[in-house]
Amino acid sequence: MADVERRASDTGVAPAASKIEFELPGQDNAVGYREYVEALDLDISDREYTRVRWKLDLTILPMFLITQALQFMDKTSLNYANLFGYQEALGLQGRDFNYLSAMVYAGYFFGQYPCGWLIGRFPAQRVIAISILLWGVMVLLMTQSQSYSSALAVRFFMGIFEAAVTPGLTLMTGFWYTRREIPLRQCIWYSSLGWGGIIGSYISMGVSKLPEDMTPERWELIFYILGGATCLWAFVIWFVLPDAPSNARFLTHRERLIAVKRVAGNETGIKNKAFSKDQVRVGFMDPKTILLFISVFAAAIPNGVVNSFSTIIIRDMGFTTTKTTQLKSVGDAVQIVALIIGGTIILNVPNSRLLTATAANLLCTIAAACMAYLPSSNTWGRLISFWLVNSQSVGFTVSLTTISSNMAGYTHRSLASAMVLYVTHLFLPALFTVLTAYCWGNFAGPFVVNQSEAPHFTGATIGLLVGYAIKLGCHLLLLAYMFTINRSRDKLYGPANKEASDEAGMRDLTEFENRDFRYVL
């Protein structure tokens, strides 16, 4: 990593002039670069700035939130179908249901690279819309999968098609919002997991009121409802969601320039269609990527438990099917509240991202310890602890914002995201690193659940405790690393030149090539 820093210091970045009339490397492939140059002399009033931000919040944010909510409900639809005899209908035995739950993440693994390449090469909203339509079809096909092997195949392809969504939305959040705005907005659209859980619980509650001998069967209705809604939503994304501020039809030309100038201040650029081999090496050598990979993998194991087996764990505490769906929605509400509180703190308290994540991780660790060591007779104590582990989403969201706010260079961000989120391929750095850890952690999660351990589920609760403890340690190390780099750069180069750093970001330089870049803690 030191040699990367040395080359960065030799390169330097010239301060941005009022007009740039010479060729700069990477500008032809950098989305929004021409608008950035045009906007350099733009005089923007506070009123215009606020109006553009509100337009983005009222247009972009709801689409992100609904897309992520549908993905979550579709991915965890087995959790609800299982309440209505899905295992019995397919004749599942032993760990068959565990493999079926995990198979979607194996699909993520193989789908991440092609989806990441497509998002970088073509309009992101087109790729995401097609992905949404295809995974919606897979959800509908679950009703026609009358054998274990066919259901496994459908779940695998569902994972492939879903692989574009979370990394795509994470990258696109950085296209639209400033570094200060990203955490709260990311927390808002990621709170869709909680909203999706609540909606899914009440859909299940409604289905539970229907006759048990009806046709189609009640578990089939779950897939019909969720799959149909997803297919319809794909058309909304295709026709309404823009790829980047520079081509947003709901903005005027001047508003597009303002939107591009806003995110130029992130020092990370918007999007670059060219693949950078140099950024691949940087991505794999980046200590941030490594720490995020470990933390997300560790936390994804308990996440796989909660997503796939929450209804079973709550039901085996002694509650009816209807009561189980109601109680599960409380945990989803905890997730929403934790994300909004965490995002608000980060927005208003400078350099509080990782400290906020640490507080949430500590709460999860304590809650997991209570689940592991409280006696089975203490039903409500264990249930409240199970609700509280949903606050782990704060730490995961901070991991995503670390990529969108603290990693420059489009290929670099993409690789890190893939490695951390669902796992993707070895060529697109940061985002894909995170997605890789997320994928395999969630794949492993269902296998720490053993039905014979009900109602205490010792293996699952110990898995929760260990996973959250590792995540807590990684976030503390990440905080120490970025703080040290900021301080050493200030000593070596003096105060950062903000204009030069903005220019470097729009040219798709990484944070290691841009000596004026400072991490947001």
Regions found by a protein language model. Name each.
Residues 1-70, 94, 238-273, 455-521:
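Intracellular terminal tails of multi-pass secondary transporters
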Residues 74, 90-91, 114, 122-123, ...:
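Helix-breaking motifs and short loop linkers at transmembrane-helix boundaries and internal kinks
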Residues 76, 105-113, 163, 197-198, ...:
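Residue-level signature of mid-helix packing/kink "hotspots" within the transmembrane helices
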Residues 79, 278-343, 400-401, 428-429, ...:
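Extracytoplasmic gate region of multi-pass secondary transporters
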Residues 133-146, 362-376, 390:
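C-terminal ends and interior cores of transmembrane alpha-helices
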Residues 183-216, 224-230, 417-445:
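Glycine-rich segments within core transmembrane alpha-helices of 12-TM secondary carriers
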